[in-house]
Amino acid sequence: MDMLSLNQLQLNIEKRNLFDLCITFLPSAITYIKGANGSGKSSLLRMIAGIMQPSSGNIYYKNSHINNCIKPYCTYIGHNLGLKLEMTVFENLKFWSEIYNSTETVPAAIHYFKLDYLLDEKCYNLSSGIQKIVAIARLIVCQSDLWLLDEVESNLSKENKDLLNNLIVMKANSGGIILLSSHQENVIKSAQILQLK
Protein backbone atom coordinates (compact mmCIF):
# COMPACT_ATOMS: atom_id res chain seq x y z
CA MET A 1 0.00 0.00 0.00
CA ASP A 2 1.22 3.53 -0.82
CA MET A 3 1.34 4.75 2.76
CA LEU A 4 3.76 7.06 4.56
CA SER A 5 5.10 5.88 7.93
CA LEU A 6 7.11 7.77 10.53
CA ASN A 7 8.84 5.35 12.89
CA GLN A 8 10.09 6.87 16.17
CA LEU A 9 11.00 10.03 14.29
CA GLN A 10 12.73 12.52 16.55
CA LEU A 11 14.09 16.03 16.23
CA ASN A 12 16.36 17.29 19.01
CA ILE A 13 17.46 20.93 19.06
CA GLU A 14 19.67 22.30 21.84
CA LYS A 15 19.01 19.22 24.02
CA ARG A 16 15.26 19.68 23.59
CA ASN A 17 13.18 16.98 21.92
CA LEU A 18 10.70 18.78 19.65
CA PHE A 19 8.82 15.64 18.69
CA ASP A 20 8.88 11.85 18.80
CA LEU A 21 6.44 10.53 16.21
CA CYS A 22 5.12 7.08 15.34
CA ILE A 23 2.33 7.58 12.83
CA THR A 24 1.13 6.23 9.49
CA PHE A 25 -0.64 8.27 6.82
CA LEU A 26 -2.84 6.22 4.49
CA PRO A 27 -3.74 7.04 0.88
CA SER A 28 -6.41 9.76 0.62
CA ALA A 29 -5.28 11.36 3.90
CA ILE A 30 -5.18 15.13 4.27
CA THR A 31 -3.35 16.18 7.44
CA TYR A 32 -2.89 19.65 8.87
CA ILE A 33 0.29 19.92 10.95
CA LYS A 34 -0.37 22.38 13.76
CA GLY A 35 1.81 23.84 16.47
CA ALA A 36 3.37 27.01 17.79
CA ASN A 37 6.29 28.69 16.05
CA GLY A 38 9.39 26.60 16.70
CA SER A 39 7.46 23.36 17.29
CA GLY A 40 9.06 21.67 14.28
CA LYS A 41 6.32 21.85 11.62
CA SER A 42 8.62 22.98 8.80
CA SER A 43 11.40 20.66 9.95
CA LEU A 44 9.04 17.67 9.88
CA LEU A 45 8.02 18.39 6.29
CA ARG A 46 11.66 18.87 5.28
CA MET A 47 12.56 15.53 6.86
CA ILE A 48 9.80 13.72 4.96
CA ALA A 49 10.99 15.43 1.76
CA GLY A 50 14.51 14.13 2.41
CA ILE A 51 15.98 17.64 2.69
CA MET A 52 16.78 17.40 6.41
CA GLN A 53 17.92 14.46 8.53
CA PRO A 54 16.05 13.53 11.73
CA SER A 55 17.93 13.19 15.01
CA SER A 56 16.76 9.57 15.05
CA GLY A 57 14.06 7.35 13.58
CA ASN A 58 13.03 6.37 10.08
CA ILE A 59 10.62 7.44 7.35
CA TYR A 60 9.08 4.92 4.97
CA TYR A 61 7.07 5.63 1.84
CA LYS A 62 5.49 2.89 -0.26
CA ASN A 63 7.22 0.33 1.99
CA SER A 64 10.72 1.71 1.24
CA HIS A 65 12.97 3.87 3.39
CA ILE A 66 12.94 7.34 1.82
CA ASN A 67 16.72 7.10 1.31
CA ASN A 68 15.99 4.22 -1.08
CA CYS A 69 13.01 5.80 -2.86
CA ILE A 70 13.47 6.78 -6.49
CA LYS A 71 13.75 10.56 -6.59
CA PRO A 72 11.71 12.65 -6.80
CA TYR A 73 9.12 10.76 -4.73
CA CYS A 74 7.20 13.81 -3.46
CA THR A 75 6.33 17.41 -4.26
CA TYR A 76 7.54 19.77 -1.55
CA ILE A 77 6.73 23.49 -1.47
CA GLY A 78 8.36 25.39 1.37
CA HIS A 79 9.09 28.99 2.25
CA ASN A 80 11.68 29.01 -0.52
CA LEU A 81 9.39 28.47 -3.50
CA GLY A 82 12.02 26.90 -5.73
CA LEU A 83 11.36 29.28 -8.62
CA LYS A 84 14.06 30.15 -11.14
CA LEU A 85 13.39 33.90 -11.00
CA GLU A 86 15.31 34.70 -14.18
CA MET A 87 13.18 32.22 -16.13
CA THR A 88 9.65 32.78 -17.42
CA VAL A 89 6.55 31.20 -15.92
CA PHE A 90 6.39 28.72 -18.79
CA GLU A 91 10.09 27.88 -18.52
CA ASN A 92 9.67 27.12 -14.80
CA LEU A 93 6.71 24.81 -15.43
CA LYS A 94 8.58 23.07 -18.25
CA PHE A 95 11.68 22.71 -16.06
CA TRP A 96 9.71 20.94 -13.31
CA SER A 97 7.84 18.75 -15.80
CA GLU A 98 11.13 17.50 -17.23
CA ILE A 99 12.44 16.58 -13.75
CA TYR A 100 9.27 14.54 -13.11
CA ASN A 101 9.03 13.27 -16.71
CA SER A 102 5.51 14.70 -17.00
CA THR A 103 5.62 17.32 -19.78
CA GLU A 104 2.06 16.48 -20.84
CA THR A 105 0.70 17.98 -17.59
CA VAL A 106 1.91 21.57 -18.21
CA PRO A 107 -1.22 22.71 -20.14
CA ALA A 108 -3.50 21.47 -17.32
CA ALA A 109 -1.53 23.47 -14.73
CA ILE A 110 -1.66 26.60 -16.90
CA HIS A 111 -5.41 26.24 -17.40
CA TYR A 112 -6.28 25.40 -13.77
CA PHE A 113 -4.48 28.40 -12.30
CA LYS A 114 -5.31 30.73 -15.23
CA LEU A 115 -1.65 31.44 -16.01
CA ASP A 116 -2.06 31.85 -19.80
CA TYR A 117 -1.44 35.61 -19.77
CA LEU A 118 1.72 35.26 -17.65
CA LEU A 119 3.59 32.54 -19.54
CA ASP A 120 6.24 34.86 -21.01
CA GLU A 121 6.73 36.90 -17.81
CA LYS A 122 10.00 36.54 -15.94
CA CYS A 123 9.24 35.33 -12.43
CA TYR A 124 11.17 38.19 -10.81
CA ASN A 125 8.53 40.57 -12.25
CA LEU A 126 5.66 38.81 -10.45
CA SER A 127 4.11 39.73 -7.10
CA SER A 128 4.82 37.38 -4.18
CA GLY A 129 1.26 36.01 -4.40
CA ILE A 130 1.56 35.20 -8.12
CA GLN A 131 5.02 33.71 -7.61
CA LYS A 132 3.46 31.41 -5.05
CA ILE A 133 0.72 30.34 -7.50
CA VAL A 134 3.35 29.51 -10.12
CA ALA A 135 5.12 27.36 -7.50
CA ILE A 136 1.83 25.72 -6.47
CA ALA A 137 1.12 24.89 -10.12
CA ARG A 138 3.99 22.42 -9.69
CA LEU A 139 1.48 20.19 -7.84
CA ILE A 140 -0.31 19.56 -11.12
CA VAL A 141 2.82 19.47 -13.25
CA CYS A 142 4.79 17.00 -11.13
CA GLN A 143 2.15 14.29 -10.67
CA SER A 144 3.54 12.84 -7.43
CA ASP A 145 1.25 11.13 -4.91
CA LEU A 146 2.83 12.73 -1.82
CA TRP A 147 2.44 16.50 -1.31
CA LEU A 148 4.26 18.38 1.45
CA LEU A 149 3.07 21.98 1.76
CA ASP A 150 4.57 24.46 4.22
CA GLU A 151 2.21 27.40 4.82
CA VAL A 152 1.49 27.69 1.11
CA GLU A 153 -1.83 29.49 1.61
CA SER A 154 -0.22 32.72 2.89
CA ASN A 155 -0.21 35.63 0.39
CA LEU A 156 -2.93 34.01 -1.72
CA SER A 157 -6.18 35.63 -2.78
CA LYS A 158 -9.42 33.95 -1.72
CA GLU A 159 -9.91 32.69 -5.28
CA ASN A 160 -6.47 31.09 -5.36
CA LYS A 161 -6.91 29.62 -1.86
CA ASP A 162 -10.13 28.01 -3.08
CA LEU A 163 -8.34 26.63 -6.15
CA LEU A 164 -5.58 25.21 -3.95
CA ASN A 165 -7.99 23.61 -1.47
CA ASN A 166 -10.06 22.08 -4.28
CA LEU A 167 -6.86 20.69 -5.80
CA ILE A 168 -5.85 19.16 -2.45
CA VAL A 169 -9.25 17.47 -2.09
CA MET A 170 -9.06 16.14 -5.67
CA LYS A 171 -5.59 14.71 -5.01
CA ALA A 172 -6.82 13.02 -1.82
CA ASN A 173 -9.83 11.61 -3.66
CA SER A 174 -7.45 10.01 -6.16
CA GLY A 175 -5.41 8.34 -3.40
CA GLY A 176 -2.76 10.95 -2.69
CA ILE A 177 -1.31 11.81 0.72
CA ILE A 178 -1.17 15.51 1.61
CA LEU A 179 0.54 17.03 4.65
CA LEU A 180 0.32 20.78 5.14
CA SER A 181 1.48 23.06 7.90
CA SER A 182 -0.77 26.03 8.49
CA HIS A 183 -1.47 28.77 11.01
CA GLN A 184 -4.88 29.38 9.46
CA GLU A 185 -8.14 27.65 10.31
CA ASN A 186 -8.79 24.24 8.82
CA VAL A 187 -10.75 24.95 5.66
CA ILE A 188 -10.84 21.31 4.55
CA LYS A 189 -13.18 19.78 7.10
CA SER A 190 -12.38 16.18 6.16
CA ALA A 191 -8.72 16.68 7.13
CA GLN A 192 -7.14 15.24 10.25
CA ILE A 193 -4.83 17.22 12.55
CA LEU A 194 -1.34 16.34 13.77
CA GLN A 195 -0.63 18.62 16.74
CA LEU A 196 3.02 19.25 17.62
CA LYS A 197 3.69 20.49 21.15
UniProtKB/Swiss-Prot annotation:
The keyword Transcription regulation does not apply. The keyword Magnesium does not apply. It is found in: Cell inner membrane. It catalyses: heme b(in) + ATP + H2O = heme b(out) + ADP + phosphate + H(+). GO terms for biological process: cytochrome complex assembly. It holds the Pfam family ABC_tran. ATP binds at G35, A36, N37, G38, S39, G40, K41, S42. One of its GO terms (molecular function) is ABC-type heme transporter activity. SMART domains: AAA (SM00382). Keywords: ATP-binding, Cell inner membrane, Cell membrane, Cytochrome c-type biogenesis, Membrane, Nucleotide-binding, Translocase, Transport. It is an enzyme of class 7 (translocase). It is a peripheral membrane protein. Residues 1-196 form the ABC transporter domain. Its EC number is 7.6.2.5. GO terms for cellular component: plasma membrane. Part of the ABC transporter complex CcmAB involved in the biogenesis of c-type cytochromes; once thought to export heme, this seems not to be the case, but its exact role is uncertain. Responsible for energy coupling to the transport system. The complex is composed of two ATP-binding proteins (CcmA) and two transmembrane proteins (CcmB). PANTHER family: ABC TRANSPORTER I FAMILY MEMBER 1 (PTHR43499:SF1). Belongs to the ABC transporter superfamily. CcmA exporter (TC 3.A.1.107) family. This is Cytochrome c biogenesis ATP-binding export protein CcmA. It comes from Rickettsia prowazekii (strain Madrid E).
